[in-house]
Amino acid sequence: MSTLYTMVAPCFFGTESTLNFEVKRLGAQNIQVTDGRVAFQGGADVIAAANLNLRTAERVLLLLATYKATTFDELFDGCYNIAWEDLLPANAAFPVKGSSLSSQLSSVPACQSIVKKAIVKRLMHGHKVGTLPEDGALYKVRFALRKDTVEIYLDTSGDGLHKRGYRKNATLAPIKETLAAAIADLGRVRRDSLVQDPFCGSGTLVIEAAQKALNLAPGLRRRFAAEHFDFVPADIWAEQRQKALDEVRKDAAFEGIGYDIDPAAVALANANAKLAGVGDRCRFEVADVRKDRKSTRLNSSHTVVSR
């Protein structure tokens, strides 16, 4: 029987319903929606599928423990009780980051040190070694203290999920890819939609809308931290990547158009669309929609204006 993991996917406030629907599509179990996050359970296949497919999640975290801690001893003991040796190899590199809010243990650096010491002691005991070289794969550990309750996480994503791999450069103040994806969903973008952005910048809104319309998984062009985790085997990643490729809607009639007064931004948007795999569904043009409405298609009855 496969191990059932508890996962937490943070998201922008107000986009929880969109992320909830995405998680349901993965076949996850025991889904719980709270402000700014969606928690769910699944096997190693769901870890891979979530990272590859979730458009509006900021990252996918494994929730390893939840417990009360008002002293450093309680913080240490709760962390030590996690079976770290089943998750991390003896040579794992495991930096620790965290936060504390409205808790008696308010010093984040001190808490980081305690969590790190607990993991070190448990790994040395579990692997029966005297030293931990930390020269292997990277396992990012996170903790969150909220009102004296600790949550310990293992980050399966690595870089945030907004980093799709297609936006090598951006204009000033670009919209985050995960937020753009949520806007596309809330705007009810479909496979036959015509989406236009009159102030496209580097093209993120149109590109995310195109990927949604084509059901093109956002994570196909990048790698994830959990691809190096022993408990998420390579064959699971290969299977989930192939599944995502098989589900692309190649017959979608989507069309995306973006306008901007900056030629450099338009060139960048076209380049990003090609890198994102939707260059044949999107085009970006230099235009000032305040003056050139007749030369654009902003009055089309099938248009979704993104801003």
Predicted feature residues:
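S-adenosyl-L-methionine
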Residues: 2-25, 32-33, 38-56, 106-109, ...
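Non-catalytic nucleic-acid substrate-recognition regions in nucleic-acid-modifying enzymes
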Residues: 2-139
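Short conserved loop adjoining the S-adenosyl-L-methionine
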Residues: 291-295
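Single conserved hydrophobic/aromatic residue that forms the stacking wall/gate
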Residues: 298-307
